[in-house]
Amino acid sequence: MGKPAGLNAARKLRNHRREERWADAHYKKRLLGTAYKSSPFGGSSHAKGIVVEKIGVEAKQPNSAIRKCVRVQLIKNGKKVTAFVPHDGCLNFVDENDEVLLSGFGRKGKAKGDIPGVRFKVVKVAGVGLSALFHEKKEKPRA
């Protein structure tokens, strides 16, 4: 059995395609709006939050390291997430109760590399870019 092929087969083809599209994960996610419901960012690319604590996350096997991360409570919805602090020594620029800007980290909302459960990274601290602080182009404002 193949596809219906005939002058009056369009409705059957269209209905079948409509039903089968629900097997596609991207289509289903888009139509049900789960990106807005389930992701902590609520579908947006960046979010601001307040640093709750600094933590070290152990890398997965076969690597052996402690990745420097922070626990952040998002301002928009109060959800707590773990965010990676990139660059060597940049954790020193981040203090508790600082306001940070977070963005995605990794692929399609999943964790990146050997850092388990960490889906976000710190981009700005107290309104200043983390890379600018790292390269000593700017200083963190005094509170």
Curated annotation (Swiss-Prot):
The keyword Protein transport appears for this protein: no
Instruction: Return the GO cellular component terms, semicolon-separated.
Output: cytosolic small ribosomal subunit; nucleolus; nucleus; ribosome
Under Gene Ontology molecular function, one entry of this record is: structural constituent of ribosome
What UniProt keywords are attached to this protein's entry? Cytoplasm, Hydroxylation, Nucleus, Ribonucleoprotein, Ribosomal protein
Where does the sequence pass through the membrane? none
Entry's localization field = Cytoplasm; Nucleus; Nucleus, Nucleolus
Q: What are the recorded Gene Ontology BP terms? A: cytoplasmic translation; translation
Q: What residues bear 3,4-dihydroxyproline in this entry?
A: 62
Keyword Cytoplasm: yes or no?
yes
Its predominant location is cytoplasm
Query: What PTM annotation applies here?
Result: Hydroxylation at Pro-62 affects translation termination efficiency.
**InterPro entries recorded for this chain?**
NA-bd_OB-fold, Ribosomal_uS12, Ribosomal_uS12_euk/arc
Q: What Pfam families is this protein classified in?
A: Ribosom_S12_S23
Q: How does it assemble?
A: Component of the small ribosomal subunit (SSU). Mature yeast ribosomes consist of a small (40S) and a large (60S) subunit. The 40S small subunit contains 1 molecule of ribosomal RNA (18S rRNA) and at least 33 different proteins. The large 60S subunit contains 3 rRNA molecules (25S, 5.8S and 5S rRNA) and at least 46 different proteins.
Q: Which family does it belong to?
A: Belongs to the universal ribosomal protein uS12 family.
Xref: NCBIfam families: PRK04211.1, uS12_E_A
Reported function: Component of the ribosome, a large ribonucleoprotein complex responsible for the synthesis of proteins in the cell. The small ribosomal subunit (SSU) binds messenger RNAs (mRNAs) and translates the encoded message by selecting cognate aminoacyl-transfer RNA (tRNA) molecules. The large subunit (LSU) contains the ribosomal catalytic site termed the peptidyl transferase center (PTC), which catalyzes the formation of peptide bonds, thereby polymerizing the amino acids delivered by tRNAs into a polypeptide chain.
What further fact does the record state?
A: There are 2 genes for uS12 in S.pombe.
Q: Name the chain's protein.
A: Small ribosomal subunit protein uS12A
Q: Which organism is it from?
A: Schizosaccharomyces pombe (strain 972 / ATCC 24843)
Q: What is the lineage of its organism?
A: Eukaryota, Fungi, Dikarya, Ascomycota, Taphrinomycotina
